[in-house]
Amino acid sequence: MATTSHMFMYSLTIQPPTAITQAILGQFAGTKEQQIVTASGSKLTIHRPDPTQGKVIPLYTQDVFGIIRTLAAFRLAGSNKDYIIIGSDSGRITIIEYVPSQNRFNRIHLETFGKSGVRRVVPGQYLAVDPKGRACLIASVEKNKLVYVLNRNSQAELTISSPLEAHKPQTLVYSVVALDAGYENPVFAALEVDYSESDQDPTGRAYEEVEKLLVYYELDLGLNHVVRKWTDPVDRTSSMLFQVPGGADGPSGVLVCAEDNITYRHSNQDAFRVPIPRRKGAMENPERKRCITAGVMHKMRGAFFFLLQTEDGDLFKLTLDMVEDDKGQLTGEVKGLKIKYFDTVPLASSLLILKSGFLYVAAEGGNHHFYQFEKLGDDDEETEFNSDDFSADPAAPCTPVYFQPRGAENLNLVEAINSLNPLVDSKVVNISEDDAPQIFTVSGTGARSTFRTLKHGLEVSEIVESELPSVPSAVWTTKLTRADEFDAYIVLSFANGTLVLSIGETVEEVTDTGFLSSAPTLAVQQLGEDSLIQIHPRGIRHILADRRVNEWPAPQHRSIVAAATNERQVAVALSSGEIVYFELDADGSLAEYDERRQMSGTVTCLSLGEVPEGRVRSSFLAVGCDDSTVRILSLDPDTTLENKSVQALTAAPSALNIIAMADSSSGGTTLYLHIGLHSGVYLRTALDEVTGELSDTRTRFLGSKAVKLFQVSVTGQTAVLALSSRPWLGYSDTQTKGFMLTPLDYVGLEWGWNFSSEQCVEGMVGIQGQNLRIFSIEKLDNNMLQQSIPLAYTPRHFIKHPEEPLFYVIEADNNVLSPATRARLLEDSKARGGDTTVLPPEDFGYPRGTGHWASCIQIIDPLDAKAVVGAVELEENEAAVSIAAVPFTSQDDETFLVVGTAKDMTVNPPSSAGGYIHIYRFQEDGKELEFIHKTKVEEPPLALLGFQGRLLAGVGSVLRIYDLGMKQLLRKCQAAVAPKAIVGLQTQGSRIVVSDVRESVTYVVYKYQDNVLIPFVDDSIARWTTAATMVDYETTAGGDKFGNLWLVRCPKKASEEADEEGSGAHLIHDRGYLQGTPNRLELMIHVFTQDIPTSLHKTQLVAGGRDILVWTGFQGTIGILVPFVSREDVDFFQSLEMQLASQCPPLAGRDHLIYRSYYAPVKGVIDGDLCEQYFLLSNDTKMMIAAELDRSVREIERKISDMRTRVAY
């Protein structure tokens, strides 16, 4: 398999994975505030919980280009800062710190101990750190454990020792935790099983008798070696350990969590055991045992408690009772355990309790939750279960205990953090007639599943909307004096006059302002210390603080057509093409410059930059003319109104704005000229502050209307508001400082301006038709907007209605009681006078039952109703597995909804009692479904597709063509085309691309005359296909279960032969090669993404953009593959990728090239995520790489940002 390619793609992530595999808590910034560090895929993110707002704010995200297996925080004694240890797939232990001044992670230590990759004998799966920060243990699933001693040297720098081994061959490890031993030797506890005897015993008796052991490993700091200190057998179902506080805080030891019970164990204490309470209820199975899946221990002054979570999401509060001495003081001896129900939260991968009284729940599926503690559940009515009533012997059966679930009493949800995990399917379509399509996704599990609309844009908070007497053309706000904090007036310009409103408790019209109300206004500015100016077509009014007015009239037969102002300068353009320039003199009056500059064409727009700090004037005036040019004129006293530079444009400019903004290439600020054209194109070009030269122009198409530009302030930074057919905001990215241009999720505006008042410090005022709107933008760190619609069960697939803006989602939940079964159980309980409480499933989940399925089809309207508008429940224990909208030629091309189901399906090992294909007719414009009939098939039909006016179905390994009959589907043709099971179908013409569950894709041709399906080309690699789409007639893009994306192409000769007239007989009798088809597909590109692709689409994401491949991943990732157009770009980005991989290697020590080649060598793909790391480098490193590539830093940054902005966001 050659790794060179003549096709190249640029791989980019537009939405990072949202599944959190682990979260840790610590004071990573070295302050008293706690931060949360989360691992999502290969991304490491630090968040700041804000207790005042009740929000979790992401501060910084870094891609480590490796698999983060485990995280741990530790602090050296006497230090006030926590460090982070990463266990990854690099075969190295990594210690990093967060540097708040640079807002980045820095690597302190990288120690190699083994092979790379996630292997059973390479440490990295488990990580435990001594509570006093003296040592850490890193362990593998089998055999190997390494202990590193952590210390500091004479310069107070963190040091790490050589590893000490604590290996035990043929031993499996289930959990590792560090004991709290105070200042005695560090001790680590592990749950282990020795399988050496059961491995040798063919009878299976040794396996039945195998014991699970709790083992203590002690690190002797004096002798510098690790000893196996204590072992004790525990319950065989034990799977999790929790550290119990020791030293002055508690008795030390561990909690051992097993199926149905929790035991306290320690080498010098008695064991105590409590059962895990089970739910009461008419629909609950009283025999179902629970396990602990997550938990957290929290220490308070003089006390501690545990919150432990079961697989239902129920939280239990567990406390330890201590023996008291004669004086009533607590001794170090444990008296018993107590457990009681606390609250129910979503099933978590990590639980964190913050000192500020919050609980952070990193959910396994769906949104992550941030709760505030209302109380600690000490004095409530909940039944408490005590270990005194239960035997501590693991062999003795534990009497089940029950509790009644209820609504939340102790926790209050303050923020739900959007998460698309697990993202099961997506569609990219434009149903709202915006200029860009929306991404629709189905994600989540159970009753917490959602249908989401994802849209590129910034969230806008509207404050005021009020109707005006007529349609205004422009609006401004102004202060009265330079020292004012807030604006005093809103000035509205109409076709025949001007209206002034004062800003206070209420907004009212005022008349004694000195403004001319009988003429429209062109510009308003607070000038000098305390005066105002109003520019109107007939002249300039200079309104002094005492309301005296100085008037400068426009020359006869000429009027003012454009104006630009700042606090010391005014420039106006006359209808004759002349530029008149004024400057504020020493006594506060406007002085006109002697000469006027005649321009070659009519002036359409002007711009003066702000006066830089410490200067008396802005040095440049930008002039846009209708001859499609922009000129930069000097305003320096020696060269006033002299031409400095000129730039030709593709259309006449409609707006100009000179703004100083943050510059990612220099790290400081740079002067930029923003240009809006009548054609709807926006340009941003750098303006040299000395020479006035224009360079580094970047363009973006914004919409069909002429662009207007306004300088605004958002979250403390200067930004540009660009208005075309919809509003856009240009700002500096909070992390990279690169320039971002993002649409606002708001109505189209005709004019905008800054607005600042006591109620809204940083807002904007805008005009939309006859309405005045005041709004603000609060967050710039998230440019993907999400709208959610709740679903009933876990979604499996969905499709769009062929014409209407409706979607049909098939949903199915395993081991969940169906609505009919639930209703029957409730009726039975009611008849017996039992409990009939029904808990809300979105909080508590559905009642469970082994072997049961709950499944339905839901109709979603995301445009108008923004809700589920119809549903069909499936009965008889059927689960929906596939869906398609199929037009049947035999029914006059009427489109029917076809749903494939499986009956009595078992997921593992896969089995079922056959399947059905249901046919539904669309009614009421698709908002209702009428059941027609269903056809039994021998296996679940996992793939359905409309094909030439008939139905194509993948049933097991057989591909079939069905037509629609009166009573059932009629089989027309079939062929065994896949080795194992067909999971996906694509088609163009008579060609069908069949995805197999574990054997990649096979191309099949349908010969209409012979009525045969003939496979003619397949793949040479067994790919476990999860998603595929045809890119063109010969090429298919796909993703597999191991996180790879690939593109395969049919050889030209094989493709032509398959389509030849009458080639059916030849193809059927063509000799197969290596038990496959006669031909093999060619691999074009291959890359590892570290997420399972669940859908692929060839589409455009932005208005006027190229076709690209958009893919979604199971963990919530949304990525794109952009084809390169020129070989020159490929060479440049390949060189840049190599330089970045060597100059700034990945944080966790993984080799970047090997990481992207996890299962097969990377081929034909350039990693855009790595290229974008260039923005985050220091200036010196940027310049060094730029010198190596023989380019300027600005040029490299432009090329990187263009790759993204031309096709995506």
UniProtKB/Swiss-Prot annotation:
PANTHER family in the record: DNA REPAIR/RNA PROCESSING CPSF FAMILY
Main location, first listed in the record: nucleus
UniProt keyword Transmembrane, yes or no: no
Keyword Isomerase tagged: no
Gene: rse1
A Pfam family of this chain: CPSF_A
Biological process (GO), any one: mRNA splicing, via spliceosome
Protein name, per record: Pre-mRNA-splicing factor rse1
Family: Belongs to the RSE1 family.
TM regions (residue ranges): none
